[in-house]
């Protein structure tokens, strides 16, 4: 077994578990980085082993296949993200605080572990049908929906708005920001944009802004 050369993070990744041996942790860390950068299909077991500093046999000791490794990583990263969002957007908080918590967790995760966030974002469609029932019970979109429903009750979100469209708008805004940030389209730290992201989302969902936009569209003859 080769000695890995990768420096440890200043903070432990959320997807590491207490009983994971060091070799498994390093394999997962380097596999995640490669998957986030190149996609699962674009990565070979040999590449993962080379980056982690371990032989292919070490990977197969823990995972039957590369796809099994990818699925395990996805479930761990997704659940860690959900738990962070859930803790920051607790049901007893008012709508504004819950939305603030969601945006804050998202941008902090982009700084703390962008590979994990981008991997979950990019692989959600293909991985979600394959995850365990326990993971499926923890829906990030469901958490956003619950937050929006509270906003409706507090008159912070328009009651006649289609929640699915609002969920798509919020998740799409955050996901595209993450991708553009990773491409260098935004300068500075992710958290520097947190306040503006939150204000954009509030404008999307607020009753007053929706009514203004609808009125303008009607005057332009855009509504049927």
Label every model-predicted segment.
Residues 107-146, 165:
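Short secondary-structure transition hinges
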Residues 1-22, 211-224:
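N-terminal intrinsically disordered/low-complexity leader segments
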Residues 23-31, 48, 73-77, 81, ...:
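Generic hydrophobic, amphipathic alpha-helix propensity
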Residues 72, 86-112, 163-170, 216-218:
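Hydrophobic alpha-helical connector segments
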Residues 117-122, 130, 152-200, 208-224:
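Hydrophobic/aromatic-rich alpha-helical bundle segments in the mid-to-C-terminal region
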Residues 28, 70, 74, 78, ...:
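Amphipathic, non-transmembrane alpha-helical scaffold segments
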Residues 2, 26, 34-68, 72:
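Helix-turn-helix
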């Amino acid at each position: 077994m080769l000695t890995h050369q990768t420096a440890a993070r200043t903070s432990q990744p959320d997807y590491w578990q207490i009983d994971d041996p060091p070799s498994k942790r390093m394999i997962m860390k380097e596999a995640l980085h490669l998957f986030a950068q190149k996609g699962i299909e674009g990565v070979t077991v040999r590449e993962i082993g080379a980056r982690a500093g371990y032989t292919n046999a070490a990977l197969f000791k823990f995972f039957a296949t590369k796809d099994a490794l990818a699925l395990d990583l996805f479930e761990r990263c997704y659940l860690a993200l959900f738990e962070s969002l859930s803790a920051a957007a607790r049901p007893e908080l008012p709508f504004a605080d819950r939305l603030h918590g969601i945006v804050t967790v998202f941008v902090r995760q982009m700084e703390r572990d962008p590979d994990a966030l981008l991997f979950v974002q990019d692989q959600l469609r293909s991985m979600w049908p394959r995850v365990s029932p326990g993971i499926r019970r923890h829906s990030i979109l469901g958490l956003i929906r619950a937050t929006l429903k509270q906003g409706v009750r507090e008159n912070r979100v328009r009651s006649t708005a289609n929640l699915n469209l609002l969920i798509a708008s919020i998740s799409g805004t955050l996901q595209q920001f993450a991708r553009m940030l990773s491409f260098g389209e935004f300068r500075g730290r992710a958290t520097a944009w947190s306040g503006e992201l939150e204000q954009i989302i509030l404008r999307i969902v607020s009753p007053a802004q929706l009514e203004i936009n609808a009125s303008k569209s009607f005057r332009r003859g855009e509504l049927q």
